[in-house]
Amino acid sequence: ITAIEIAAAKHPDGTPIVPEVCIFFENELMRGNRTTKINAENFNAFRSFNYPPLAKAGIHIRYNEHLIRRPDPSRPMKPHYLFDTNVVVLTLFPGIQESIINSVLHVPGLKAVVLKTFGSGNAPQKEWFIRQLKEASERGIVIVNITQCQSGAVEMGRYETGLQLLQAGV
């Protein structure tokens, strides 16, 4: 019932209190594009690690109005229906082999790689790894660095390994 109340809630001028896509679970309203499913079995199954709840529900619903995005009425909504499927998510792991990286970076038609690195953006320091990323970047493949951690962010210049990625075009 609370999810329906939130979806139907309006300001006095008739505009929705929460005009965005959200997930309501375990008494918290989370921004949809910031939320991850963390558990397949428990009720506390969703979490927004890097963004606070838009609302919390108990006896009353308490909205964090300053966190809720308001649409710009001068710009009509422009949904994106076609997404480029020539993008791969590559999760790094200790001992990853050169042949795996080579295979991924040479997929025909590949346009982008989402590189899931360690901690604040660290990756193997192997010469072949940095070289392959640099060559892929020079071929026009976009490579972005995200952390495997559930919270926090990448800081490419923080450690030498992250700096090497930056110099390779990541």
What are the language-model segments listed below?
Residues 9-19, 45-56, 144-153:
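Short, surface-exposed, charge-dense and proline/glycine-enriched linear segments
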Residues 120-170:
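C-terminal non-catalytic interaction/assembly regions of soluble proteins
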Residues 22, 28-120, 125:
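Accessory alpha-helical/coil subdomains and C-terminal extensions
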Residues 1-27, 31-34, 170:
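Short, glycine-/small-residue-rich phosphate/pyrophosphate-handling segment
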Residues 2-6, 28, 53, 103, ...:
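Alpha-helical scaffold segments in soluble metabolic enzymes
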